[in-house]
Design a protein with these regions (language model features):
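Thiamine diphosphate
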Residues: 4, 9-155
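Basic phosphate/pyrophosphate-binding loop/patch that engages nucleotide-derived ligands
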Residues: 1
């Protein structure tokens, strides 16, 4: 049916959904938390960082909706637009270049269907490096503190 791209990280992460009831569906995202101040849309291991950020933001009075987008193409446009309309601001998070990834896909959809303030957390336009995963997340600004900073720029 065509090319497929799967990406697996090196880190052990928590399970975010009920394995007994969750059914993976290409092109469908999953809302993990309720929130109305900002939508944090994440993919891959950044979902864990987004959940950590949302918990800390909650302690500061900011209600963040965390969405896990397992697939970027096709993108769950309905879920993305709904979150943008209901929250009024969006932060995307990806362990990937901000060029050509989740952030650009979400920005394209929102630009046409629901323009809202938005920030992208991801690897800037630089060459990558090899090394221990947690060190690289810190080096490239992909930890929860970077997500929190991006949220605070918007709300």
């Amino acid at each position: 049916q065509g090319p497929v791209y799967l990406r697996f990280g090196r880190l052990a992460l928590p399970v975010f959904h009920d394995e007994a009831t969750f059914k993976f569906e290409i092109g469908k995202g999953e809302q993990l938390t309720e929130g109305s101040d900002v939508a944090i849309i994440a993919t891959g291991l950044e979902v864990n960082e987004a959940l950590i950020a949302a918990e800390q933001l909650k302690n500061e009075g900011i209600q963040a909706r965390v969405i896990n987008l397992c697939t970027i193409k096709p993108l769950d446009e309905e879920l993305v637009v709904k979150a943008a309309k209901e929250c009024g601001a969006v932060v995307t998070c990806e362990e990937h270049s901000i060029l050509g990834g989740l952030g650009e896909a979400v920005a394209a959809v929102l630009g046409e269907q629901c323009p809202v303030p938005m920030r992208r957390v991801g690897v800037k336009d630089v060459f990558g490096h090899s090394g221990p995963a947690w060190e690289l997340l810190e080096q490239f600004g992909l930890r929860s503190d970077a997500i929190i900073a991006a949220v605070k720029e918007l709300v």
